[in-house]
């Protein structure tokens, strides 16, 4: 963080501490329809036009440490195979054989020098190219180059693996914009995966997400974190601490 950023942060904290009303020219926002959180049709639209066109965190390099290691990721409605092609590169494909659509990978994690469909034995390399099929003599005028696995766009942010189902999507760096440079201080390339937990919540995904985007609930839910000087406490920056800013 350079001096200009430090001064800007101090000015913002000072402004927020003194503020007694909404910021000037703050727009009047409409109420959100309740169906945005309950309607299946709206959720289906989100999956189609949001999740399929966004960069999604799919894993960590520590989960596929060796060349040929793979992970089956199925968190967005489309099972994806993440493959450690080399030390620096990861490839990603839909978990669907180009012959009859059978799943190629069944286990969540594994390692193999090639990807083999267990149904009819079609075989693919780590780039998704079809490199072998059983009884090739029975396939007349067959072009193997047209039968590669369907790719999923994949990029690394340090040791973090991100995927995007939209092959024409802008790069992860372009998508993050100015945030990309700001988050470099976290040094994702030096972070190791120690453990991970999965929690299933009986709510729409936006309910869980928004709970981590606002502090309006802190006084009620996290009362042990709330002090008499909460207005100032909430404006602090604890570098290296376990704080949500």
Predicted regions and their residues:
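A short, aromatic/hydrophobic, helix- or strand-capping loop or linear motif
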Residues: 60-63, 220-224
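N-terminal pre-ligand scaffold of iron-sulfur
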Residues: 1-96, 100-107, 152-156
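Extended catalytic-interface subdomain
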Residues: 150-222
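Conserved small/polar residues in nucleotide/adenosyl-binding loops
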Residues: 226-233
